[in-house]
Regions:
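Hydrophobic alpha-helical signal-anchor/transmembrane segments
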Residues: 1-91, 190-198, 203-206
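Juxtamembrane/interface alpha-helical elements of multi-pass membrane proteins
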Residues: 60-151, 156-167, 174-176
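Membrane-associated alpha-helical segments
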Residues: 154, 158, 162-206
Length: 206
């Protein structure tokens, strides 16, 4: 119903035009459609249970709360997608570093790999990697660019990785091992979360 580019624009609240992944501003039209949709569903549910137009109409008032609930769902979904995309980025970047490439060259290679995995140019991780490369091209450090990304992502896995990444860059630590370890950890968390969701869904239908 709403294009990904439009959704990305509505999600941006910062003056610099970058995405804050904890923010999603629902457009007026989108909000209206969500309220109407929720009102119809609530009316139908109310009528099935109460067989009363009056009570069903009262239940429709709860539809006003739906845009906020939907906004939180969109934010959560976007952050889950970003986590998975970040895992793929780490895998590609660690592969590039393992053959002797610099971090900067590795990011360029990782971006090319990600463009194959995610053909939509508006995919979050593609936009973030492109922004990081532009920043590096303007003489910003890799550490500062990743740190900015982590601040906007509001994701523990990314924040933890960036903290270790910055330390490794300063002390000469094993970046390849850090990236592989972080990628594996994220993958394990995703698998556990999916198993829990599958179990919960299964119990609902028992």
């Amino acid at each position: 119903m709403f294009g990904k580019k439009k959704e990305m624009e509505e999600m941006t609240e910062r003056e610099d035009g970058l995405i804050d992944y904890n923010v999603y501003v629902m457009g007026t039209g989108e909000k209206a459609i969500n309220i109407v949709f929720a009102a119809i569903v609530l009316f139908a549910v109310g009528y099935v249970f109460y067989h009363s137009i009056f009570l069903s109409a009262l239940l429709m008032l709860l539809a006003l709360k739906w845009p906020k609930i939907r906004t939180n769902q969109i934010i959560e979904k976007r952050k889950n997608q970003l986590t998975l995309q970040f895992k793929d980025m780490l895998y590609s970047l660690s592969s590039a570093l393992s053959v002797g490439k610099s971090v900067e060259s590795g990011i360029e290679d990782a971006l090319k790999d990600l463009q194959v995995i995610y053909p939509d140019p508006q995919t979050e991780i593609l936009l973030e990697m492109e922004y990081i490369l532009r920043g590096i091209g303007m003489n910003n450090t890799t550490e500062s660019m990743f740190s900015q990304f982590a601040e906007r992502a509001h994701l523990e896995d990314i924040e933890n990785f960036v903290d270790i990444f910055v330390t490794c860059k300063r002390t000469g630590g094993d970046l390849i091992e850090v990236m592989r370890s972080t990628s594996n950890t994220i993958g394990e968390k995703i698998e556990v979360k999916q198993e829990i969701e599958t179990t919960i869904s299964g119990k609902k239908y028992e």
